Amino acid sequence: MKFAVIDRKNFTLIHFEIEKPIKPEILKEIEIPSVDTRKGVVISGRGPIWLHCFLAHKYHHTPFVAVYDPRLGAVVVQSHSELREGDVIDVVVEEILKGGVRHV
């Protein structure tokens, strides 16, 4: 499993890629990328729902956590900011990823 971290003005995109099938036990070993905790986090990647939940929990201390849905944008699922749960951030992750990424 690898992560790409892309800093944007108002949030940090954490995009993950899974290279082979994973099992829940991997959660004990995942080292999540560090982020600027003054900005929210958008989580993106194809994987099991339990992985998305795990990552959302790990970043709960940031101003907000949003999960990317390619049909909608980034849906806010947790917030300690002016954004509210259910707000949608207009973002196209595929376009951001084209601009180059740093894998961690």
Curated annotation (Swiss-Prot):
Entries under InterPro entries matching the protein: CRISPR-assoc_prot_Crn3/Csx3
Similarity comment text for this entry: To A.aeolicus AQ_377.
Transmembrane segments: none
Protein name per Swiss-Prot or TrEMBL: Uncharacterized protein AF_1864
